[in-house]
Design a protein with these regions (language model features):
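Charged active-site motifs of nucleotide-sugar-dependent glycosyltransferases
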Residues: 5, 232-236, 261-262
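Aromatic- and Gly/Pro-rich donor/ligand-binding loops
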Residues: 6-178, 225, 249
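An anion/phosphate-binding loop that grips the pyrophosphate of nucleotide cofactors and donors
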Residues: 124, 183, 299
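Catalytic donor nucleotide-activated moiety binding site of glycosyltransferases and closely related
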Residues: 158-165, 197, 241, 248-285
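A conserved, positively charged/aromatic
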Residues: 177-182, 296
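A short beta-strand/loop micro-motif in the catalytic core of glycosyltransferases
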Residues: 183-190
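Donor nucleotide-activated moiety binding/catalytic core segment of transferases
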Residues: 205-213, 217, 273-302
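Conserved donor-binding/catalytic core segment of Leloir-type glycosyltransferases
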Residues: 229-243
Length: 302
């Protein structure tokens, strides 16, 4: 008897360096496969014309587009201002891409253009989306993350999806109700997501664990054993910061002074943060997902 084909809309693309997203994708893949299903990562290559862009641009701008443009401008400015920033980011990107090419890409199925994506959905016994911040307002207009492309006859569900915001724009309320009510089952990873789902649709949402929590510590240690990176032999503090808050960086420095332990830090994860340059005894960039989990598991403090 052949395995049922499951399509996954999962944050797993190349050229992104978020380790959390990478580990969530890996855990999701392993769990679905362990349940006996044939998993395919559904990949959408957009092919939009000028008219397509004109139709969605107002919505994009009202859903975080201006902030995204500001982030892109800041990244370009920081690359010019700080000599090693771009080259170090490329080192990190190469490492994460190498992992994804080995673990994820063999299960990718690419669809070029929306029509092809819709037709491709008919090949699956079910399609799901998750986890991570797959329902951020900015991604609404792709009709990809919300599974609008999936044929009506194909069962759809979400696993541990997140909006990443406390509220969604009013312009998306009707569309949110529409895509949620097409799903057989909705699960989210936080209470705010549950509130949004139940406020704007007739669906009931279940709050579930992040997929990384579904693998055992033994499984994660086995995963980390694939790392060829040496970690410090003496006790160390591992720091992985998203955002630019200086207070948590100062607390890490205080802990280092109090314990005498050195700091291993992943600098400038989602933006250039000057404070990152003020702490850390070891700041590696050539770190893949296996190395990341190894650094976590061997640390005295995280």
């Amino acid at each position: 008897m052949s395995k049922k084909k499951i399509g996954g809309v999962i944050v797993s693309d190349l050229n992104h360096t978020n380790y959390g997203s990478c580990l969530q994708a890996y855990a999701t893949m392993k769990i679905v496969q362990a349940l006996g299903y044939d998993l395919t990562f559904i990949k959408y290559i957009k092919q939009r014309n000028v008219w397509d862009w004109l139709k969605i641009t107002p919505g994009l701008m009202l859903s975080g587009g201006f902030e995204l443009l500001d982030q892109k401008k800041k990244f370009k400015d920081d690359c010019k201002r700080y000599a090693d920033y771009m080259s170090n980011q490329q080192i990190r990107l190469n490492a994460t891409n190498a992992f994804k090419k080995q673990e994820f890409v063999p299960f990718f199925k690419e669809y070029k253009g929306y029509k092809s994506l819709c037709e491709g959905s008919k090949l699956f016994d079910a399609v799901f989306v998750g986890s991570d911040q797959v329902w951020r307002p900015f991604g609404f207009y792709s009709n990809y993350w919300n599974l609008n492309f999936v044929d009506d006859r194909v069962p759809k569900f979400s696993y541990a999806s997140s909006y990443g915001v406390s509220s969604i724009p009013s312009i998306q309320h009707k569309g949110t109700k529409r895509y949620l009510e097409r799903m057989k089952m909705v699960s989210v990873r936080e209470m705010k997501g549950k509130e949004i789902v139940e406020q704007y649709s007739n669906q009931k949402a279940q709050v579930v664990s992040d997929p990384t929590m579904l693998l055992t510590s033994k499984e994660w240690l086995e995963f980390a054993s694939h790392s060829h990176k040496e970690t410090p032999t003496e006790p160390y503090i591992f720091c992985y910061f998203l955002g630019s808050r200086e207070d948590i960086r100062k607390e890490a420095a205080k802990l280092s002074m109090h314990t005498g332990f050195k700091i291993v830090i992943m600098r400038h994860m989602d933006e250039y943060v000057p404070a990152d340059e003020t702490i850390g005894d070891y700041a590696p960039y050539d770190i893949n997902a296996w190395d990341f989990v190894k650094l976590l598991s061997n640390a005295a403090y995280v």
